[in-house]
């Protein structure tokens, strides 16, 4: 069955080959201050 992982590969996996990476949000959520500034900008003509 291809759905089940090969247990020998899992038990013999070398974690030292993994590298640390710095993750960065591609589309971060706006802060409350940013939302308030945008709302104030929309209300003025």
Swiss-Prot record:
PROSITE patterns reported in the protein's UniProt record: THYMOSIN_B4 (PS00500)
Database matches in Pfam families: Thymosin
Coiled-coil annotated spans: none
GO cellular component, one term: cytoskeleton
Location within or outside the cell: Cytoplasm, Cytoskeleton
Biased composition (Basic and acidic residues): 12-25, 33-45
Family classification: Belongs to the thymosin beta family.
Function: Plays an important role in the organization of the cytoskeleton. Binds to and sequesters actin monomers (G actin) and therefore inhibits actin polymerization.
Name listed for the protein in its UniProt record: Thymosin beta
Organism: Danio rerio (Zebrafish)
Record lineage: Eukaryota, Metazoa, Chordata, Craniata, Vertebrata
Gene field: tmsb
